[in-house]
Amino acid sequence: MRWIGVLVTALVLSACAANPPANTTSPTAGQSLDCTKPATIVQQLVCHDRQLTSLDHRLSTAYQQALAHRRSAALEAAQSSWTMLRDACAQDTDPRTCVQEAYQTRLVQLAIADPATATPPVLTYRCPTQDGPLTAQFYNQFDPKTAVLNWKGDQVIVFVELSGSGARYGRQGIEYWEHQGEVRLDFHGATFVCRTS
């Protein structure tokens, strides 16, 4: 699962690139899938799953809105890279969850890049020295509620999860659980505890 995190990081960095290669974009990268003839296993999965189809339509709309406000080669290249990332979910041990998180992540990336989105404060946690700094921003206005974590220079987007107590966020390979001033984290098997104050 760690490769998914690396690909997501690469996607975010490519979106910020000043001059991406001119031939990296696809004219259909932002369009909803054509479910009359899905071309890949992942496209078949999306077309036969109501929730994934809804996410596909939401992403198409969000991407077209982003293009209308700030068309750029970097935005188009990031969307094409995201399409490859989504399609790579066919190799994941849990393709459906991988695809769902890919769509949710891209929706969040586009929303955060929108100047109209309110930017929440950055929270800094006290962690053991060897575990390095951890910061978080919570976008409670998103659906689902989202946290953007930064740990040792890596940014990851996690989504709210059901919790009996405290605040829990996660995605494949990553867990964040805050309870009574203590934050327990698991980043692809690296577990540690930080404090909120």
Swiss-Prot record:
GO terms for cellular component: cell surface; extracellular region; plasma membrane. A lipid is attached at residue 16 (N-palmitoyl cysteine). It is a lipid-anchor. Changing residue 28 to A: Decreased apparent weight in M.smegmatis, a portion of the protein is protected from extracellular trypsin. It is found in: Cell membrane; Secreted, Cell wall; Cell surface. Glycosylated; alpha-D-mannosidase treatment decreases its apparent molecular weight. Glycosylation probably helps target protein to the cell surface; mutation of predicted glycosylation sites (Thr-24, Thr-28 and/or Thr-117) makes protein partially inaccesible to externally added trypsin. May also be glycosylated on other residues. Glycosylation is probably not necessary for inhibition of lysozyme. Changing residue 117 to A: Decreased apparent weight in M.smegmatis, a portion of the protein is protected from extracellular trypsin. SUPFAM superfamilies: YdhA-like. Induction: Constitutively expressed, increases in stationary phase (at protein level). mRNA levels rise nearly 50-fold during mouse macrophage infection. Part of the glbN-lprI operon. Disruption phenotype: Probably essential, it cannot be deleted. Homodimer. PANTHER family: LIPOPROTEIN LPRI. This is Lipoprotein LprI. It comes from Mycobacterium tuberculosis (strain ATCC 25618 / H37Rv). The lineage of its organism: Bacteria, Bacillati, Actinomycetota, Actinomycetes, Mycobacteriales.
